[in-house]
């Protein structure tokens, strides 16, 4: 199985499913109660209480990840991005790149709405600025087309260049 990071894992719903499919899952969330629930529902995965701003340090990654210490896939679901403090948004996106192995992918999904003001266009621009490729964008987990300016949900498939 792949080495997968569940960024903003909450109570471990996504990580549990990925672990059940045979992947090596590490979940990170800022809320210790949610991490305790994740440990309860999926004790064989690794669950860490931490802020995504501190992601590389918490995972023991200095500089950019290598094939030995990085993740092949990062999943960030559940509106995590929409609730980040404005000052931490781009650093968190950069951390996503830093923890991916060369050629690794990130799948990030979140919605717009009250209290969630990280504009999709800004998120995609931030991803490009920190060195991630934007490979695909969708307006749902069912892969409906993303329409800039009218979609209320974004699922972005990003990748760290292989070299």
For the regions a language model picked out, list residue spans one by one.
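A short SAM/SAH-binding and catalytic strip from SAM-dependent methyltransferases
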Residues: 72-87
């Amino acid at each position: 199985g792949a080495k997968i990071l569940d960024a903003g894992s909450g109570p471990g719903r996504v990580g549990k499913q990925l672990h059940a499919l045979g992947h090596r899952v590490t979940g990170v969330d800022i809320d210790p109660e949610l991490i305790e629930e994740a440990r309860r529902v999926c004790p064989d995965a690794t669950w860490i209480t931490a802020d995504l701003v501190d992601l590389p340090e918490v995972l023991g990654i200095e500089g950019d990840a290598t094939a030995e210490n990085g993740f092949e896939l990062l999943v960030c679901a559940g509106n995590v991005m929409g609730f980040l403090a404005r000052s931490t948004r781009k650093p968190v996106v950069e951390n996503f790149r830093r923890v991916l192995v060369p050629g690794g992918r990130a799948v990030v999904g979140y919605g717009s709405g009250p209290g969630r003001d990280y504009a999709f266009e800004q998120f995609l621009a931030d991803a490009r600025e920190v060195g991630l490729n934007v490979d695909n964008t969708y307006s749902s987990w069912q892969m409906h087309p993303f329409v800039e300016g009218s979609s209320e949900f974004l699922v972005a498939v990003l990748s760290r260049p292989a070299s």
